[in-house]
Regions:
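Intrinsically disordered, low-complexity, hydrophilic segments
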Residues: 1-67
């Protein structure tokens, strides 16, 4: 799945993001609003990980998203 599809249907994918990253709040996910870089930043911030690790996690999420 490509990010444009996720971005266009963010409300649908928010639940999957919440399952993958249980520490993210509803406010975090609303702030992301389908923006990939914002999601990377929020994951990095909440989990205290390096940007490249957060990027890898988001890429994994992108690859495994289900419509």
């Amino acid at each position: 799945m490509n990010w444009d599809q996720i971005k266009g249907n963010w409300k649908q994918f928010k639940g999957q993001a919440q399952q993958k990253w249980g520490d993210l709040t509803g406010d975090d996910l609303d702030r992301v609003d389908g923006k990939r870089e914002e999601l990377v930043g929020v994951v990095q911030e909440r989990y205290g990980i390096a940007k490249d690790e957060a990027e890898k996690e988001v890429k994994d999420f992108e690859s495994n998203c289900r419509c």
